[in-house]
Amino acid sequence: MTTVSRHYVLAAGGTGGHLIPAFALAVELDRRGHHVALVTDERGAKIPGKPDFLPAHVLPAGRLGKNPVALFKGLRAIWQGRAMALRLFESFEPSCVIGFGGYPALPALLAAHAARIPTVIHEQNAVLGRVNRLLAKRVDAIATAYGEVDRLDPKLWGKVHRVGNPVRPDVLALRGEPFPEFTEDSLFRVLVTGGSQGASILSEVVPDGLAMLPPALRHRLQVTQQCRPEDLEVVRARYAAHEIPAELGTYFEDMQARLAGTHLFIGRAGASTIAELTAVGRPAILVPLPIATDDHQAANTREVVAAGGARAIRQSGFTPKELAKQIQAMAQHPHTLANAAHAAWNCGLPNAVKDLADLVESFGASPIMDVIRLDSTVSAASGQEQLA
């Protein structure tokens, strides 16, 4: 724990995947007595879950397009964002700038490098993202969620720290809860989500796949499924036709409570999703998003699948028959599902936010406690304010 209060800037792209771990770190740094500010884009400033104490500064940020016009526009926006970030740093005086990926993080990190402010990047996925690849050689430390990170230059291993993906405190609080009782006579609770926007492929496949289960499993089903608004009535009709009780919605406020009571999760393989599943210890059938950059969702599944805590099905092979086959293999015998839950739990890194905060605190003014390098063998394989 530090003995001085410092200022930190978190820079993150405007999606939940980048911002959820940033919000978690903000809460931890605030708890330790520090002042924290967020730099993001207009989307990011509106993402639900931002702590009330955290001001969000909106900076221009452009993508580096392939055609000359798009490239010029992107570079101009990045340069403008860099200049605005430098003005913010003059008044806020951060001890460190922490990037969580996404193009909106780029201007602030470039500004920090120019101002000789220490920088840390956090990679949520098992593939180093584009912006983090651009910055990896320049930053002072690279925090990773996985022990194997593709597209990470082996020459940079010396500044890599495996910390994991920070998860929300309300989810982390479930880590000590036992896996829900699952016997040959109990309910079989299945939770299905497709990320922040739902996933139509899950709406198309899951109801029919569950209907193909043996009667001993099918008759015990209790399903909760997140759907896109346009899919709700069609999915409702499918479950009704199969006589499977299902609660459907576009968003569930009490998702952590539903996760606590779940026996099996079916959904995408985003980094935050897997971090929460392994923090709580819930077995899963994961369907990686096929258009994810660098196929990073498929890479995210490697560790938990190898451990026996989940099964992965490529979307091209995600059929009702294949889903039913995989569910039956996991849940036909109660001990099999319980073993998978334990394997998932063992993959969790519950101290991720603490370890990331310790790493961040190792840069800037002293005295502070030494940060422990967690894994030196990582392999390469709204308080919104518009800056003037």
UniProtKB/Swiss-Prot annotation:
Q: Where does UDP-N-acetyl-alpha-D-glucosamine bind?
A: T15, G16, G17, N125, R168, S196, Q297
Task: Give GO terms: molecular function aspect only.
Answer: UDP-N-acetyl-D-glucosamine:N-acetylmuramoyl-L-alanyl-D-glutamyl-meso-2,6-diaminopimelyl-D-alanyl-D-alanine-diphosphoundecaprenol 4-beta-N-acetylglucosaminlytransferase activity; undecaprenyldiphospho-muramoylpentapeptide beta-N-acetylglucosaminyltransferase activity
Q: Which UniProt keywords apply?
A: Cell cycle, Cell division, Cell inner membrane, Cell membrane, Cell shape, Cell wall biogenesis/degradation, Glycosyltransferase, Membrane, Peptidoglycan synthesis, Transferase
EC annotation from Swiss-Prot or TrEMBL: 2.4.1.227
Q: List GO terms (cellular component aspect).
A: plasma membrane
Query: Could you tell me which pathway this protein works in?
Result: Cell wall biogenesis; peptidoglycan biosynthesis
Function according to Swiss-Prot or TrEMBL: Cell wall formation. Catalyzes the transfer of a GlcNAc subunit on undecaprenyl-pyrophosphoryl-MurNAc-pentapeptide (lipid intermediate I) to form undecaprenyl-pyrophosphoryl-MurNAc-(pentapeptide)GlcNAc (lipid intermediate II).
Q: What is this protein called?
A: UDP-N-acetylglucosamine--N-acetylmuramyl-(pentapeptide) pyrophosphoryl-undecaprenol N-acetylglucosamine transferase
